Amino acid sequence: MSAAALEEIGIAPLQENTSLRPPPLPATCVDVSSDDYIKLTTLERQLAHLQVMEDYIKLETRNLEKELLHAQEEVKRIQSVPLVIGQFLEAVDQNHAIVGSTTGSNYYVRVLSILDRELLKPGCSVALHKYSNALVDVLPPEADSSIQMLRPDEKPDISYGDIGGLDMQKQEVREAVELPLTHGELYQQIGIDPPRGVLMYGPPGCGKTMLAKAVAANTAASFIRVVGSEFVQKYLGEGPRMVRDVFRLAKENSPSIIFIDEIDAIATKRFDAQTGADREVQRILLELLNQMDGFDQSTNVKVIMATNRQDTLDPALLRPGRLDRKIEFPLPDRRQKRLVFSTVCSRMNLSDDVDLEDWVARPDKISGADINSICQEAGMQAVRENRYVVLTKDLEKAYKNVVKKDTNDFEFYK
């Protein structure tokens, strides 16, 4: 009932005891639930755990860095020279391989775990531990090769103008070697393949090697010079491997020119060989034939060969497709003699009474090297007599010494 109704019937209403009320909360107090408190304590425990984990990881990292440094020092000690050079033959599994040593034996060896397996290709050069023969390193392709390219500062300082005569030979060499490297689109427009190889043959001293030097000096292509006898090695298989190295190096640095001097050392006609040395030389020739057939025309690799004995070369090497152009270097005729004499003597201080036509008209068969030797000897005669001018008598004496000197007559000691 309400307070007014109670008063009407004479009953006083109950008074509210304000002392029993709780005091009001201050405005600055926040009611924190128990869920938030639990979350806070959980996060604090997780933070403490993460800090412990961080300290543990830092300590473990320091230990691993020490182990890595120790392992690197151990690898350096293992890979320290001297090491044995071998050849990778076949991978057995991830940790073992078969390698060949320079002694001709094959070994089943362990492979260092840190080596990049992508570099281990059949035929690549590897380094073997001296005692265990374990494969500890992969060598660069040219590390054990004796075949080197001529650096720009090593190229001979010879131009075509320094070679007297040989106009036709110069033109043929430039058409077969230089033109395909500099203007290969001409052959594509005509629809023909450029020559792959050139054979220069003729008597000694007729300018074959000198013309090859001029080609090396006047082209921007990489130039690789080898002598045929370099391919003949002591151990079986070394010669064919060197042939492969030459053509591999030429392909990697194309456009390039390979000049093989004295090719008759390895390219004589094949026969029924009775000795191991003869069979090895024939294997070198077979590898050379295979490489000349195998390299792609687009690699811009040209081959120049020189020999004094073209009649002894194997017919398989001379066929078109391998050596497309054969250039003869004969003994100089009268016109060529005049050009050679003029070229060589252009750098000499000759007397006004010297008439080179006198020596040009002589019928003796002499080569360009003989003419150069005559002029050099004439200069030495002038030096001997303390003169700065070469006289006619100097050239005459030099001509007799070089051309008409009897091998059993040593006039120097008379």
Swiss-Prot record:
Q: Which GO terms describe its molecular function?
A: ATP binding; ATP hydrolysis activity; proteasome-activating activity
Which GO CC terms are listed, alphabetically? cytoplasm; nucleus; proteasome regulatory particle, base subcomplex
Summary of the function given for this chain in its UniProt record:
The 26S proteasome is involved in the ATP-dependent degradation of ubiquitinated proteins. The regulatory (or ATPase) complex confers ATP dependency and substrate specificity to the 26S complex.
Q: Which family does it belong to?
A: Belongs to the AAA ATPase family.
Name of the coding gene? rpt-3
The record, for Pfam families, names: AAA, AAA_lid_3, Prot_ATP_ID_OB_C
The residues the record assigns to binding ATP are: G202, P203, P204, G205, C206, G207, K208, T209
What keywords tag this UniProt record?
ATP-binding, Cytoplasm, Nucleotide-binding, Nucleus, Proteasome
One biological process GO term for this chain?
Answer: proteasome-mediated ubiquitin-dependent protein catabolic process
Would the keyword Transcription be found if you checked this record's keyword annotation? Answer: no
Specify the superkingdom. Answer: Eukaryota
Q: Which organism is it from?
A: Caenorhabditis elegans
State the compartments where it is located.
Cytoplasm; Nucleus
> In its UniProt entry, what is this protein called?
Probable 26S proteasome regulatory subunit 6B
Keyword Nucleus belongs to the record: yes
